[in-house]
């Protein structure tokens, strides 16, 4: 019995030292401001409350106010029980804790997805869609409902804040990956990290990417699931340890790759990246494929200085 107790204490001490060695794990406690939010919203929004309660944010005591706080004068800020908050959590907000990830994302084509809305491609699509029967205060001339609930949900919308401070329903809710936010930032972290659980397992799942990478003009999801990679994933997905904080192919799993495995996730030789272009050696979107550094140069992105050979090596490694 004494030996069991000693071993247990040693295990606890070892775990404690391990946590301490990893550095800060979050806030010491839920803030008073967030506690005030939770007091009401645990009953008003029980689903959101439960999702947050199962998240790593919960374990780090990062709650409502830490993400939704705003300041008087910001475009989408409104006063709520004496505090200024915003409904939209933009990459600028996430950068308070996740600066490296946001910087990488901002350098990627993902974050620029909303720029297509002003392009000739998009104008052509709007003409083809035709019906502009979805009229809102921000768009009295109307929009095609198929664009609002289709194209914009992947590429992102340009969020419009109405005169009364509310968000135009044609542009919000929206989690498009290239959303243009009221604070001027581009992108939406929740395109991949679905609120409010922000599950790593969910973000790594092929269906997460397949929400947008599917269909006749970008059929990556269909190609993946019909490939040996997709067949293996379907057979062994319960054995891939997709919820682990550390998720390195060849160490934590080996039976099948997901989209994230090759394009984003950590390997034995390189860290996670949120710039998906750093492992792609061709840009196949144009009618004639181009090297990614060419496309990056046109968009003014840092990747213009990263040759395709380096990106190919990143993918191989």
Task: Provide a role label for each language-model segment.
Residues 147:
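Active-site-adjacent structural elements in enzyme catalytic domains
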Residues 7-16:
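Bacterial N-terminal signal peptides
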Residues 1-5:
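Positively charged n-region of N-terminal signal peptides that target proteins for export
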Residues 23-24, 47-62, 76-144, 157-317:
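Primarily the internal scaffold of c-type cytochrome electron-transfer domains
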Residues 17-21:
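Boundary at the C-terminal end of the N-terminal hydrophobic targeting segment
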């Amino acid at each position: 019995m004494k030996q069991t107790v000693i071993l247990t204490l040693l295990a606890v001490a070892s775990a404690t030292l391990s946590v301490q060695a990893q550095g800060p794990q979050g806030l010491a406690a839920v803030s008073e401001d967030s506690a005030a939010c939770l007091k009401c919203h645990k009953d008003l929004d029980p689903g959101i409350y439960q999702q947050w309660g199962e998240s790593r944010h919960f374990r780090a005591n990062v709650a409502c106010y830490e993400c939704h706080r705003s300041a008087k004068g910001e475009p989408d800020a409104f006063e709520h029980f004496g505090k200024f908050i915003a409904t939209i959590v933009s990459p600028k907000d996430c950068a308070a804790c996740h600066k490296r990830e946001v910087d990488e994302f901002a350098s990627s084509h993902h974050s620029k997805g909303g720029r297509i809305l002003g392009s000739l491609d998009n104008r052509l699509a709007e003409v083809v869609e035709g019906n502009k029967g979805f009229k809102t205060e921000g768009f009295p001339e109307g929009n095609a409902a198929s664009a609002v609930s289709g194209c914009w949900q992947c590429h992102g919308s340009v969020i419009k804040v109405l005169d009364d401070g509310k968000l135009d329903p044609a542009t919000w809710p929206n989690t498009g990956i290239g959303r243009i936010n009221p604070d001027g930032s581009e992108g939406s972290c929740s395109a991949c990290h679905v609120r409010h659980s922000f599950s790593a397992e969910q973000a790594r799942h092929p269906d997460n990417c397949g929400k947008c990478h599917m269909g006749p003009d970008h059929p990556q999801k269909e190609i993946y699931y019909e490939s040996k990679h997709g067949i293996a994933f379907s057979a062994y997905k319960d054995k891939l340890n997709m919820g682990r904080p550390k998720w390195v192919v060849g160490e934590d799993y080996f039976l099948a790759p997901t989209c994230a495995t090759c394009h984003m996730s950590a390997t034995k030789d390189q860290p996670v990246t949120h710039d998906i272009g750093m492992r792609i050696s061709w840009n196949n979107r144009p009618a004639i494929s181009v090297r990614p550094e060419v496309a990056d140069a046109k968009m003014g992105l840092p990747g213009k200085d990263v040759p395709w050979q380096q990106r190919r090596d990143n993918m191989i490694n």
